[in-house]
Amino acid sequence: MRPATRIFIKQRFTDYYDKARISPPSSVKEREFGFIFFDDRYPDDIRMRRHIGFSSGDEMQEYVKSLVPAHAYYSTAYYRTPQAPTMGDKEWLGADLIFDLDADHIMRGSYEAMLERIKGEAEKLLDVLDNELGIDMRTIKLVFSGGRGYHVHVQELAFRDFEPAERRELVDYVCGTGISPSLLLHDWKPGRRGWHDRFRLVLTRYLQDLSTRPIKEVKAELSSLRGVGQVMAERFAGMIPELITLLNTNPSSILLRDQTVRTVFGALTSERESTLLPHIREAAVQADEPVTTDTRRLIRLPGSLHAKSGFKVVPMEVKELHDFDPLIDAVAFGEREVIIESEREYSFSLLGSSYDIPKGRLKVPEAVGVFLCCRGMAEIGGVLDHAS
């Protein structure tokens, strides 16, 4: 990043923080804060200034406004002395339960596609927290990270004292880590929810798909699994309609059906080449597990700006997620024209418009210029004096 580009981004961030009112996190006096600044080394050598505490939300606001950070964070933990220079001296008082969803850990693709995919993961997670874990949704704070994902903060007091091992159990359940598909079927009872019913639905859809395909194709797919030959594959294929019925009436009886069913299901749920396994993984939530188990984590400050995108870190109510579009709702800047220089061609959407960026110099809206410069896709070439 050229110095002029860094200065341009910091100027835009300064304008934002001059006007923005950032709501402090709850119990602000018990939170540690950390910041990354636009110093001469940024972004090649990033260093965080942490072990910072504030006595009030106004003090936090004034600090951010005067120093204009590139990135702002606060602790998910509560401390008696958050500004103490060592973790041992802070005196840990508990921590919010956090789930981090980051598209970069799930897929590669366009920024727009990644944002759409991770929104689906957020909706899936919220459904699990509400309908399977019984968490009071009024205690959940949902935040768009400003980058490629969402942070789900569970501030229910019952979880605040959980140690890493207890948090691990929760995130393992959410992510489906260590589940036993055969046990899920064996233990199934009418009305049972959670992974038992999720796996039943996954298996039902998988068998329904097999039932629509040519028998030759089904035999080839099943017989490719270890321990499943052509004869067994053909016999299993003939049983699919009956198995679908059982999955909808008495799933626990399926594994008692006969050895063919046990062998094929065993291979489908364990063999690396199984075409069922991706569907099981898709039924899980793709959360970043280490974030949940870390009881001293720093996480992005809602209302701040993310200097790798120029987007706002947006807090929202759970009910607002469905209509939230980060490519519109998280954009902090407007239409004033700036000049950028790009060494490559790019295509993307922002603020409801599609942009095709050619190589070379180009006038673009400020929102587009900040986005491209923050992501390292362009350098600033100038700001038009006549723009308003």
Swiss-Prot record:
* Gene Ontology terms: biological process: DNA replication, synthesis of primer
Protein keywords: DNA replication, DNA-directed RNA polymerase, Magnesium, Manganese, Metal-binding, Nucleotidyltransferase, Primosome, Transcription, Transferase
| Key word Manganese present | yes
GO CC field: DNA-directed RNA polymerase complex; primosome complex
Q: Please verify whether the record's keywords include Chloroplast.
A: no
GO MF, one term, reads: DNA-directed RNA polymerase activity
Pfam families, alphabetically? DNA_primase_S
- Bridged cysteine pairs (disulfide): none
> Under which main EC class is this enzyme filed?
transferase
Cofactor names from the entry are: Mg(2+); Mn(2+)
User: Catalytic site residues?
Assistant: 100, 102, 288
Q: What is its EC number?
A: 2.7.7.-
> What is this protein's function?
Catalytic subunit of DNA primase, an RNA polymerase that catalyzes the synthesis of short RNA molecules used as primers for DNA polymerase during DNA replication. The small subunit contains the primase catalytic core and has DNA synthesis activity on its own. Binding to the large subunit stabilizes and modulates the activity, increasing the rate of DNA synthesis while decreasing the length of the DNA fragments, and conferring RNA synthesis capability. The DNA polymerase activity may enable DNA primase to also catalyze primer extension after primer synthesis. May also play a role in DNA repair.
Concerning its family, UniProt says: Belongs to the eukaryotic-type primase small subunit family.
The record's subunit annotation is: Heterodimer of a small subunit (PriS) and a large subunit (PriL).
| Record's protein name | DNA primase small subunit PriS
Q: What is the species of this protein?
A: Methanospirillum hungatei JF-1 (strain ATCC 27890 / DSM 864 / NBRC 100397 / JF-1)
What gene does the UniProt entry assign to this protein?
Answer: priS
